[in-house]
Amino acid sequence: MVQERHPQRKGVCWTLRLWSTAVISMLLLSTCFIASCMVTYQFTMEKPNRRLSELHTYHSSLTCCSKGTMVSEKLWGCCPNHWKSFGSSCYLISTKENFWSISEQNYIHMGAHLVVINTETEQNYIIHQLNESLSYFLGLSDPQGNSKWQWIDNTPYPNNIKFWHPHEPNLPEEWCASIVYWNPSKWGWNDVFCDSKHNSICETKKIYL
């Protein structure tokens, strides 16, 4: 009878070891999963939080608008207070005239840049915010004066949409672009001297929360 008990003990001990190993494995997997989620969450939130911190450095308050209908679907897009919100960007229309380079430097210090127009819809939105008696610098220039225009954010110019007035750009000495209202063609782009003073349009990306 004693000899018959040994196989049973071996079987029980093996079963317990297997169960213990399974429990330990599950705990390790759970720990790894939680750690992975924490890393993913931190990675996902780090960039928006950094961007939010940057905006707060330049602006005392933000205006956020929600998207989605259910609480779980809501996504908040934030712009500096008093800026115009459209698509994934925020816009500020300047009330002061300045040189192209100074306007761009001022906007860089605000965490933004002169506007880059990528679509007709964006252009149409912007022109509804403008004064027809004024001219506004864009983030578009020809730094070498060799007809190689480039956007301030390195958006490829040749493949991008263009809204030049007829016969513009027309002078190699005019290295900067503005948007201006002319009859009968209405709003369009014009090349101007960079050291002439114009109003300007500022753009920055929304921060999503």
Curated annotation (Swiss-Prot):
Source organism superkingdom: Eukaryota
GO-annotated cellular components: external side of plasma membrane; plasma membrane
Disulfide cross-links: C64-C78, C79-C90, C176-C194
Membrane topology: Single-pass type II membrane protein
Amino-acid positions noted as binding alpha-D-mannopyranose in the UniProt annotation, renumbered to this chain: E168, P169, N170, E174, W182, N190, D191
Membrane-side (Extracellular) residue stretches: 44-209
Sequence positions that bind Ca(2+) 1: V116, N118, E122, E203
An MF annotation (GO) of this entry: calcium ion binding
Positions of glycan attachment: N131
Keywords: Adaptive immunity, Calcium, Cell membrane, Disulfide bond, Glycoprotein, Immunity, Innate immunity, Lectin, Membrane, Metal-binding, Signal-anchor, Transmembrane, Transmembrane helix
Binding residues for Ca(2+) 2: E168, N170, E174, N190, D191
Segments crossing the lipid bilayer: 21-43
A GO biological process held by the record: positive regulation of canonical NF-kappaB signal transduction
Compartments it resides in: Cell membrane
Gene3D superfamilies hit by this protein: Mannose-Binding Protein A, subunit A
Pfam family membership, one: Lectin_C
Main location: membrane
Topological domain ranges for the Cytoplasmic compartment: 1-20
Location of the C-type lectin domain: 86-203
PANTHER family (alphabetical): MANNOSE, PHOSPHOLIPASE, LECTIN RECEPTOR RELATED
Domain remark text: A short stretch of the intracellular domain (AA 8-14) proximal to the transmembrane domain is required for association with Fc receptor gamma chain.
Its biological purpose: Calcium-dependent lectin that acts as a pattern recognition receptor (PRR) of the innate immune system: specifically recognizes and binds alpha-mannans on C.albicans hypheas. Binding of C.albicans alpha-mannans to this receptor complex leads to phosphorylation of the immunoreceptor tyrosine-based activation motif (ITAM) of FCER1G, triggering activation of SYK, CARD9 and NF-kappa-B, consequently driving maturation of antigen-presenting cells and shaping antigen-specific priming of T-cells toward effector T-helper 1 and T-helper 17 cell subtypes.
SUBUNIT field: Associated with FCER1G. Heterodimer with CLEC4D; this heterodimer forms a pattern recognition receptor (PRR) against fungal infection.
Protein name: C-type lectin domain family 6 member A
Name of the gene encoding the protein in the UniProt record: CLEC6A
